[in-house]
């Protein structure tokens, strides 16, 4: 019995003190020689049993929080009690009148026996908010609550049309998620992973995607006006018809992206890489592409009036039927064919 209490206390500490994949694996792995032997001969039976209990602990916590809090932004209760967890009582005592330790005290009890642990308040609150987020948007609870960086684990989540205005999604994992038509206006997505996500028609204006991963994402028709995409990874992303007015993409990796039909008026793409990018019928008036790497990029029927390509790499860059008036190309590196094209254009417009 004592070992059972210790095991459950360890699970509670891992789930609500860390919430990561590594913490889940550590908490659900066999602990004794006997458990390792049984686990081996049952082809992982001990681990499966522990994983089931771990998941039940998370789901019970989520339901308890949902039933005791008016919304996920409300203060957490000072005492959270989970009854009948495998015959045990699990209690979380937050700092307050009855707890001056500054940490969340976890107490697992059964009859006259108990086990106590402590977990950081900041981690506990972040994990509880993540559970409530899933409840609010009807997402099934996952045994991995947070990423290794401390963001929410929302991998593959279906959040179509969700209102995520000003949401904190820093370091979150939204890879493969479906956010079609969602509103992320002013959302903080710094360092988040949106690889392969569907962001078609999303409202991302004034949002922060600094150093975020948007590789292979589908962002057709999305609004990114005034968004911060500095240092973001947008390789192979589809940005067809996006509105990116005054968007900051400086230093972003946009290799092989498709920006056809996009509006990039006054967008800052300085130092960005757009090698092999496809840009057809886009509006890029007054766009800043200084020091950008545009090698083998293809500009077709695109308006580059007033764009700044100073010091850009234009080797083997294709410009076909483009508007090049007032274009700046000082110290740009370009192939002979590109230089000839610019010379012919300027001579025709003198």
UniProtKB/Swiss-Prot annotation:
Residue runs in coiled coils: none
Any GO CC annotation of this UniProt entry: extracellular region
Subcellular location: Secreted; Host membrane
Domain Pentapeptide repeat: 162-201, 202-241, 247-286, 287-326
Keywords: Host membrane, Membrane, Repeat, Secreted, Virulence
Secreted found in the keyword field: yes
TM region(s), chain numbering: none
SUPFAM superfamilies recorded: Pentapeptide repeat-like
Main location: secreted
Record InterPro entries: 5peptide_repeat, Pentapeptide-BTB/POZ_domain, PipB2_N
Role according to the record: Effector proteins function to alter host cell physiology and promote bacterial survival in host tissues. Involved in the reorganization of late endosome/lysosome (LE/Lys) compartments in mammalian cells. Necessary and sufficient to link kinesin-1 onto the Salmonella-containing vacuole (SCV) membrane. Required for centrifugal extension of lysosomal glycoprotein-rich membrane tubules, known as Salmonella-induced filaments (Sifs), away from the SCV and toward the cell periphery. Required for virulence, but not for intracellular survival and replication in phagocytic cells.
Domains as described in the record: Contains various tandem pentapeptide repeats in the C-terminal region. The pentapeptide motif is required to efficiently recruit kinesin-1. No position is completely conserved in these repeats, whose consensus sequence is A-[DN]-[FLM]-X-X. The C-terminal 38 amino acid residues, specifically, the C-terminal motif LFNEF, are required for peripheral localization of PipB2 and redistribution of lysosomal-associated membrane protein (LAMP). The N-terminal 225 amino acid residues are sufficient for type III translocation and association with Sifs and SCVs, but not accumulation in peripheral vesicles.
Quaternary structure and interacting proteins, as annotated: Interacts with the host kinesin light chain (KLC), a subunit of the kinesin-1 motor complex.
Name of the featured protein: Secreted effector protein PipB2
Organism expressing this protein natively: Salmonella choleraesuis (strain SC-B67)
């Amino acid at each position: 019995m004592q070992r059972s209490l210790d095991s459950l206390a360890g699970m509670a500490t891992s789930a609500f003190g860390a919430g990561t994949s590594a913490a889940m694996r550590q908490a659900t792995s066999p602990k004794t020689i006997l458990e390792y032997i049984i686990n081996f001969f049952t082809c992982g039976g001990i681990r499966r049993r522990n994983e089931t209990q771990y998941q039940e602990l998370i789901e019970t916590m989520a339901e308890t929080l949902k039933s005791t809090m008016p919304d996920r932004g409300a203060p957490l209760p000072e005492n959270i009690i989970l009854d009948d967890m495998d015959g045990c009582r699990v209690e979380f005592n937050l700092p307050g009148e009855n707890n001056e330790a500054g940490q969340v005290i976890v107490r697992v009890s059964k009859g006259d026996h108990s086990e106590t642990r402590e977990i950081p308040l900041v981690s506990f609150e972040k994990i509880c908010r993540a559970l409530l987020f899933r409840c609010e948007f009807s997402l099934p609870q996952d045994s991995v609550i947070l990423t290794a960086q401390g963001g929410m684990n929302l991998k593959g989540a279906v959040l179509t049309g969700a209102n995520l205005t000003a949401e904190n999604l820093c370091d979150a994992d939204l890879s493969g998620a479906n956010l079609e038509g969602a509103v992320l206006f002013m959302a903080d997505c710094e360092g988040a992973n949106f690889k392969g996500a569907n962001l078609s028609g999303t409202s991302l204006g004034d949002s922060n995607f600094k150093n975020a991963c948007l590789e292979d994402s589908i962002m057709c028709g999305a609004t990114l006006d005034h968004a911060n995409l500095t240092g973001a990874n947008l390789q192979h992303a589809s940005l067809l018809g996006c509105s990116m007015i005054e968007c900051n993409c400086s230093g972003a990796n946009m290799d092989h992206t498709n920006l056809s039909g996009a509006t990039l008026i006054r967008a800052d793409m300085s130092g960005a890489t757009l090698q092999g990018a496809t840009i057809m019928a886009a509006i890029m008036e007054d766009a800043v592409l200084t020091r950008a790497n545009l090698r083998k990029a293809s500009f077709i029927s695109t308006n580059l009036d007033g764009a700044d390509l100073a010091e850009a790499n234009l080797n083997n860059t294709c410009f076909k039927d483009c508007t090049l008036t007032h274009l700046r190309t000082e110290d740009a590196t370009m192939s002979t064919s590109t230089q000839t094209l610019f010379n012919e254009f300027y001579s025709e417009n003198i």
